[in-house]
Each structure stands twice: as C-alpha cells, then as structure tokens.
Amino acid sequence: MFNYSGLNEECGVFGIWNHPEAAQLTYMGLHSLQHRGQEGAGIVVSDQNELKGERGLGLLTEAIKDDQMERLKGYQHAIGHVRYATSGNKGIENIQPFLYHFYDMSVGICHNGNLINAKSLRQNLEKQGAIFHSSSDTEVIMHLIRRSKAPTFEEALKESLRKVKGGFTFAILTKDALYGAVDPNAIRPLVVGKMKDGTYILASETCAIDVLGAEFVQDIHAGEYVVINDKGITVKSYTHHTTTAISAMEYIYFARPDSTIAGKNVHAVRKASGKKLAQESPVNADMVIGVPNSSLSAASGYAEEIGLPYEMGLVKNQYVARTFIQPTQELREQGVRVKLSAVKDIVDGKNIILVDDSIVRGTTIRRIVKMLKDSGANKVHVRIASPEFMFPSFYGIDVSTTAELISASKSPEEIKDYIGADSLAYLSVDGLIESIGLDYDAPYSGLCVESFTGDYPAGLYDYEANYKAHLSHRQKQYISKNKHFFDSEGNLNV
C-alpha cells in the first residue's frame, strides 16, 4: 500500500547464533527488514563472556554507522531490531534491542508487536518498586522475567510470556542462548532458518533468511518459543491456550512480496486477492494501474482476471524514504508529492482502474485520484484489495483509534465522493480469506481480521474501555449484524 496517511508497521526482529561475523550478518538481515520500521535500529552481540550493543535513530545506515559496526566485530551471536513506534515515544531510549546488565547475567531483548496489557502490568510493577528507563512496552517483559521466582531463565521467560497479552514476537539473547517467542495467536510472524555451516537464524520474515543464502527451517507457531544454543535448536510451547490468527495485514501490506508466511507467498496472495476483487467488482475501463509498491501484485491480478492492460501509470521515487511509515500526518502527506507522480502520456484521456491495498484515513488516495485526473485521466475507478478498514488495530499497527478510520463513519458511497473517484469497491472478508488460502481449524481459517470485523482474537484488555466508548454508529451496526468468535479477553465464544 502507498497510503502515506494510513497504516504504520510495528518492527522487525532478527537473531543469529554461532557465526564469526554475527553482527555483519545481522546488519544484512535487518536491511532486508527495513520496510518494517524506519525510526531506529540496533544490534546487540554476545560471546561466552559479555553482551554489548549499538543503536541509533533513523534508517539502518543512519542508525548504525561503520565505526559502530567495528565495535561489534568478533562476537558469535547477535540480535537486531528495526523500529516503528506503536507504543512509547520516538527517542533513542526506546530504540531496541534493550540491553540489561544484572549482577548474575546480561540480557538483550527486542520485540515486534504490541502488548495490550502493558499499561496495567507496568502500573503493578511500579507499585512493587520497578523502575522503567523507557516508555516502550518491551521493557515490561524484562521486569516480569527478573521478578519471577522460577529456577532458570527459560522457566522465567515461559512464566512471563503467559502474563503478557497481544500480538508479539520476541528475540532475546544471553551469553548462553538465543530465544524467540510468538504470541498465542501467532498474529506476528517469526521464522527459523539455517545456513549451510549450521548457523541458525531467527527473523520476522523469510526474506531476511533468503538474503543470507540460508534455508527455511520452520515457522514458530502460536504459543511457541524456540531456544537456540550450542546444542542445537529446540521448539517448545509455553501455553496450550492457542488459536491461530495470523495478521491478514502481513499479507495485504506489511511483508515483502518475496516473503512466505505460513506457507503462503505474499506476492501470490496479493495477486490472488486482485483476481478475486476483479471477480467481485468488475468495471469497464481502458487499463489497470496499481499504487506502488505493495499494490502492484494485486493490480496485476486484477488486470489479468478482467483482461485489461496492466500499465505503469504511477511512478514512485525509489530514493525517498518510505514516507508511509513516517510518524506524523504532515510528513506522510508531504511524502505523497515527493514520492509519487502520474505518467501523463499513459493516463491522459483514459478510464482507469486504480488498485490500492487499503484505505485508512482516505487523504492519500484522494490526492492520488486528483493527481491522475489532473494528468488527464477521464475516469478513475478505485478498487481496494482488502475489506473496509473499519476498526482500530491494537496488535502492532499504529491505527489504534476510531477517529483515524474513514470507514468507521462513512459508507463506501460517501468515501467515493470524498476521494473524488468515479466508483469504489472493496474486497469482501470472505474473498480475502479465500485469496490468502489458510486452512487452520480456527475462525477466519486462521487469520486475524480484526480491523475489518472488530473481532479481536487476543482480546482488548487495557484498550477495552476507550474502544467501546468511542464506537461509531456504523461500527455498532456492523458488530450487531455479524458474528464475533472472540470475547474481550480473546477467549472463543461458545
């Protein structure tokens, strides 16, 4: 999606165990995950004696410079992180991995997602005397681990993971092991890879494994954690109260098209969603164009299904930072003009089908429609390769209030008029589920579609009161007419 006024991804995590150039490979892995966050990056390394780290603000190349990388050489194990702030402010103190030095051990930790009970946990911990050095929810898990009475670090980790709620993955490093963990719904992805020399890798996406020439080993599934050390790799469960609900937005927008999630290639899923969208909402036109970059696969599928030319009517400046993930509305809107331009010779006098992957606030797609018409387009029919984004997300996407969502208060017809399109149609929820093609024995075939349905598989917890207080009339109507599988604590409704 190129909706600069829209969604923001959470983060990307990476880990590697037992390689003489651990920091350098981590840097490469993080580079392939840069699309998941641009506000900051960090790397923590370890050997059998110590842990040390470097971090900074900005893109990876800005955050960790050559002199910092020099200081990380010579260590065999590492974790790394690229950040977009979904909780906590945007200062250096919130850049991960966090590194803790205790009297008996040192620990590095980084996190992708959002802990929806972090506020209440933090309040309880502070009442017990805990001191926090950041506003990030990631720090909560470390306090829980250290306050555990469990006899080993692994047992303390398991106990702590059972206390936190939300959509998350963790990568944790000690001098003895590399740990990874996934929430009880597997909302956020985590995969394991293995290099030819036996080195194990953890990553948010398979693209970070592929870039190092490693082989995919397995997904870490709902409620599982992995331990990687000199003895090898072990995958265990920390809870059996699991219901798979993989974030549909990973497929729709966040993941790279060359990544594979739960056995489904992201590009193939997006193309299938475009085909399904064409079946559900065809329209007469001269051509199909996609909004660069993540909508291009869906646009090609739409064009192929409907039998129209697929043209490059919009050009993206590849050398500007991914402004969509910029933290302020003003920067996102300025980014539209800097990053995107219409190809006048292609669109002039034509009836266009414009495919995008979602509409969140609506301001960016409105600018794009105007840009195309200013360049001579006769008609612009907007087709969205996902359902209406009607409900906030609390699991690691930075759209956590109803006020941010145009579909929460406006009908498709009203949105069509607002954005200046000649027609507007969305992919149905059933069409999305079919396009992705998961077959888990779970609601929505194992997808988390909370932003389209208001059905929250991990519950609401700290967000519940505010969420319910601000439900719009349109949201309430949708909820009353559609079955919900989960209650406010993420339990399956019987």
From Swiss-Prot:
<dbReference type="InterPro" id="IPR029057">
    <property type="entry name" value="PRTase-like"/>
</dbReference>
<dbReference type="InterPro" id="IPR029055">
    <property type="entry name" value="Ntn_hydrolases_N"/>
</dbReference>
<keyword id="KW-0328">Glycosyltransferase</keyword>
<dbReference type="Pfam" id="PF00156">
    <property type="entry name" value="Pribosyltran"/>
</dbReference>
<keyword id="KW-0808">Transferase</keyword>
<comment type="function">
    <text>Catalyzes the formation of phosphoribosylamine from phosphoribosylpyrophosphate (PRPP) and glutamine.</text>
</comment>
<comment type="similarity">
    <text>In the C-terminal section; belongs to the purine/pyrimidine phosphoribosyltransferase family.</text>
</comment>
<dbReference type="GO" id="GO:0009113">
    <property type="term" value="P:purine nucleobase biosynthetic process"/>
</dbReference>
<dbReference type="InterPro" id="IPR000836">
    <property type="entry name" value="PRibTrfase_dom"/>
</dbReference>
<dbReference type="GO" id="GO:0004044">
    <property type="term" value="F:amidophosphoribosyltransferase activity"/>
</dbReference>
<dbReference type="GO" id="GO:0006189">
    <property type="term" value="P:'de novo' IMP biosynthetic process"/>
</dbReference>
<keyword id="KW-0479">Metal-binding</keyword>
<feature type="binding site">
    <location>
        <position position="356"/>
    </location>
    <ligand>
        <name>Mg(2+)</name>
    </ligand>
</feature>
<dbReference type="InterPro" id="IPR017932">
    <property type="entry name" value="GATase_2_dom"/>
</dbReference>
<dbReference type="InterPro" id="IPR005854">
    <property type="entry name" value="PurF"/>
</dbReference>
<feature type="domain" description="Glutamine amidotransferase type-2">
    <location>
        <begin position="11"/>
        <end position="231"/>
    </location>
</feature>
<keyword id="KW-0658">Purine biosynthesis</keyword>
<protein>
    <recommendedName>
        <fullName>Amidophosphoribosyltransferase</fullName>
        <ecNumber>2.4.2.14</ecNumber>
    </recommendedName>
</protein>
<feature type="binding site">
    <location>
        <position position="294"/>
    </location>
    <ligand>
        <name>Mg(2+)</name>
    </ligand>
</feature>
<dbReference type="GO" id="GO:0000287">
    <property type="term" value="F:magnesium ion binding"/>
</dbReference>
<keyword id="KW-0315">Glutamine amidotransferase</keyword>
<comment type="pathway">
    <text>Purine metabolism; IMP biosynthesis via de novo pathway; N(1)-(5-phospho-D-ribosyl)glycinamide from 5-phospho-alpha-D-ribose 1-diphosphate: step 1/2.</text>
</comment>
<feature type="active site" description="Nucleophile">
    <location>
        <position position="11"/>
    </location>
</feature>
<dbReference type="InterPro" id="IPR035584">
    <property type="entry name" value="PurF_N"/>
</dbReference>
<feature type="propeptide">
    <location>
        <begin position="1"/>
        <end position="10"/>
    </location>
</feature>
<keyword id="KW-0460">Magnesium</keyword>
<dbReference type="Pfam" id="PF13537">
    <property type="entry name" value="GATase_7"/>
</dbReference>
<feature type="binding site">
    <location>
        <position position="357"/>
    </location>
    <ligand>
        <name>Mg(2+)</name>
    </ligand>
</feature>
